């Protein structure tokens, strides 16, 4: 996460995703309607951990401008692009395991996966 308001184990619904640090042809934005009562979040899909924060002031950030994105990720835009191409709706939930800049030893992946599983199970009820 890039936002100090989010903590390990929080689950959010990504409603907008932008691609960072790529040529203009690949710098796309993807938006989806809200489908849950989870907190809505925006994301930046990156190639390198920490790249979202490093590129916030660059013009290529599109809709974000200099606003701090809530979540940094590496795969979200790829899934969104495939779904757009196939004209298929999708929902993107993301569990927070760490803040950008945290050492890998500080990441709480197991806690995030557990929280995501609980959120998905609650939606099934």
Spans of features found by a protein language model:
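Glycine-rich phosphate- or other oxyanion-binding loops that anchor nucleotides, phosphorylated ligands
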Residues: 1-125
């Amino acid at each position: 996460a890039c936002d100090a308001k989010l903590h390990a184990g929080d689950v959010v619904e990504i409603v907008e995703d932008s691609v960072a640090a790529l040529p203009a042809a690949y710098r796309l934005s993807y938006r989806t309607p809200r489908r849950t009562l989870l907190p809505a979040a925006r994301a930046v899909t990156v190639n390198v951990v920490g790249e979202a924060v490093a590129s916030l002031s660059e013009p290529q950030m599109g809709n974000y401008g200099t606003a701090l994105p809530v979540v940094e990720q590496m795969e979200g835009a790829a899934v969104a692009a495939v779904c757009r191409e196939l004209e298929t709706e999708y929902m993107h939930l993301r569990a927070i395991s760490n803040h950008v800049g945290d050492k890998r030893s500080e990441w709480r992946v197991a806690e995030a996966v557990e929280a995501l599983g609980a959120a998905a199970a609650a939606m099934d009820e």
